[in-house]
């Protein structure tokens, strides 16, 4: 019998020794010939058995798409060989780990099983998420001009509660990471400290996005104790633009807290998150230097989410492609000088270079006021109330919307639909935070999270990905554009991909009703 071992050097000898010494494993064979993986092997047909360690599983699948069809495919895990087709064994190991409160082993097994489900393209999965984005509060002390709080304030806002924590206890043993933000400022949550302590008791690493307007000594303690990353929202490096974008916040207070975070939490990774818009496009390189000065490891620039309610289409810097190209290139160069990573969306053509057109675009940008007058904001709020009523946003069932036709090609599957859901404080579950208007289900409507995790909508989403089709709600996805998705790619997307698709049933019905008038 010929066996191919695909493993790290340290595991190769362990696996070979295991095979040679554990006679029961190949008791029916006279001899076993072991080979180690080399790039020259392009055809696996000559091997009767393949052994892959946990660290090379994903690479093996990338190299050999059909590897999961092998009857004799084994996983080297925790010092033993496990037949990949024997799903019950890993499940049993997981149950024992949870019972023993061995959280690290439970998480490790769950992650392996997630990979195996993905490799075997299972639409129905028996694993829990390894990451969870869970809203801590939907209250916010700011009214940023690109956010629903701009027109809705804290209408309909909720705070974390014990009922929610109890309902999610089913997931906690398996989670590696909890992302503690949603549509509010997490450091205003009344149960922030208690939530952190609960998550930490299960060995869960934490991260969150904050506007950094609040940073108490207790926050500092919790960040150092339990957080692997802090992501800070900041869209300008001057007082006028910062306070114009992030209404109700103080630039001086932000700088003070950024210094405290830098000096008192030196070992925690820090990321600055900035939304690209007309108002800040001229200071992008300065923002990179600003982020570096205050101890950030990375600055991520994201595209503006255009809102029909706010009417901010002209704030989108895609309207100013030559200036965007110039400023983004300067920002990247500044990152190299300052030693900070700069991440930008892939939707911009950085080859554009024309100073005359840049000047014309700057004139257009400054021909409109950067910020609205109070009476204009009140008019937006009145319009929003006429559209969404008492809620701060419209939430629809994804199953009622339009996202399964005329789709772009893709390779792989988005991790959000197999290991990383987003849950708000109503208990509504969404595919991701970008699509937080389209509900897949509600945790309080199901006895077990796994029942929701495998409802008809989730199965349809996974099946589309496995068939090489990108669901319609993924068009112009920020995670695809900034390259943060590890298991999904959209090769050579057309220009149409960079336009957000209107999948909303409410939007379709609204347009039809107005067309009839």
Feature locations, PLM:
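Extreme N-terminal starter segment of soluble prokaryotic enzymes
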Residues: 1-3
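A short acidic/small-residue loop/turn micro-motif
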Residues: 436-439
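Conserved C-terminal portion of the radical SAM core fold
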Residues: 173-181, 200-207, 226-234, 252-400, ...
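Ser/Thr/Gly-rich flexible loops in soluble cytosolic domains mediating phosphotransfer, phosphorylation
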Residues: 62-101
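Conserved alpha-helical substructure of the radical SAM core
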Residues: 108-229, 240-256, 263, 286, ...
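A short, well-structured beta->alpha microelement
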Residues: 21-44
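Structural motif
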Residues: 5-11, 52-57, 76-80
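N-terminal pre-core extensions flanking Radical SAM catalytic domains
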Residues: 85-152, 169-173, 347-408, 418-420, ...
């Amino acid at each position: 019998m010929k066996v191919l071992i695909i493993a790290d050097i340290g595991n190769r000898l362990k696996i070979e020794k295991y095979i040679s010494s554990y006679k029961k494993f190949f008791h029916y064979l006279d001899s076993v010939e072991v080979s180690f993986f080399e790039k020259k092997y392009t055809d696996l047909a000559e091997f009767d058995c393949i052994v892959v360690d946990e660290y090379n599983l994903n690479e093996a699948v990338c190299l050999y798409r059909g590897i999961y069809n092998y009857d004799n495919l084994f996983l080297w895990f925790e010092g033993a060989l496990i037949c990949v087709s024997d799903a019950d064994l890993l499940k049993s190991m997981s149950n024992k780990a949870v019972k023993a409160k061995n959280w690290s082993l439970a998480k490790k097994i769950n992650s392996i099983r997630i990979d195996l489900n993905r490799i075997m393209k299972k639409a129905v999965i028996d694993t829990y998420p390894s990451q969870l984005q869970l809203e801590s509060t939907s209250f916010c002390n700011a009214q940023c001009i690109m956010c629903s709080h701009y027109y809705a304030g804290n209408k309909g806002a909720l705070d974390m509660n014990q009922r929610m924590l109890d309902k999610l206890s089913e997931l906690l043993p398996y989670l590696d990471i909890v992302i503690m933000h949603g549509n509010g400022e997490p450091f205003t949550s009344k149960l922030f400290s208690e939530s952190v302590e609960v998550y930490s008791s299960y060995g869960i690493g934490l991260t969150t996005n904050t506007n950094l307007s609040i940073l108490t000594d207790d926050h500092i303690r919790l960040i150092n104790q339990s957080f692997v990353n802090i992501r800070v929202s900041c869209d300008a490096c001057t007082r006028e633009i910062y306070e114009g974008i992030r209404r109700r916040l103080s630039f001086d207070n932000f700088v003070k807290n950024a210094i405290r975070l830098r000096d008192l939490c030196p070992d925690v990774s820090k990321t600055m998150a900035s939304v690209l818009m007309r108002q800040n496009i001229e200071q992008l390189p300065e923002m990179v230097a600003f982020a570096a000065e205050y101890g950030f490891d990375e600055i991520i620039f994201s595209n503006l989410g255009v809102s029909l309610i706010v009417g901010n289409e002209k704030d989108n810097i895609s309207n100013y492609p030559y200036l965007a190209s110039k400023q983004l290139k300067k920002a990247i160069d500044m990152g190299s000088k300052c030693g900070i990573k700069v991440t930008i969306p892939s939707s911009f053509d950085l080859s554009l270079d024309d100073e005359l057109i840049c000047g014309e675009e700057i004139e257009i940008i400054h021909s409109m006021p950067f910020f609205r007058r109070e009476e204009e904001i009140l008019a937006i709020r009145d319009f929003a109330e006429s559209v969404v009523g008492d809620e701060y946003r419209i939430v629809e069932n994804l199953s009622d919307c339009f996202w399964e036709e005329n789709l772009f090609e893709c390779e792989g599957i988005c991790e959000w639909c197999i290991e990383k859901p987003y849950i708000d404080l109503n208990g509504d579950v969404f595919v991701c935070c970008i699509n937080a208007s389209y509900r897949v289900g509600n945790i309080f409507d199901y006895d077990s999270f796994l029942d929701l995790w495998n409802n008809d909508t989730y199965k349809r989403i996974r099946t589309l990905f496995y068939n090489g089709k990108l669901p319609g709600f993924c068009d112009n996805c920020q995670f695809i554009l900034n390259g943060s998705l590890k298991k999904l790619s959209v090769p050579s997307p057309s220009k149409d991909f960079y336009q957000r698709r209107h999948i909303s049933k409410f939007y379709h019905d609204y347009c039809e009703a107005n067309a009839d008038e």
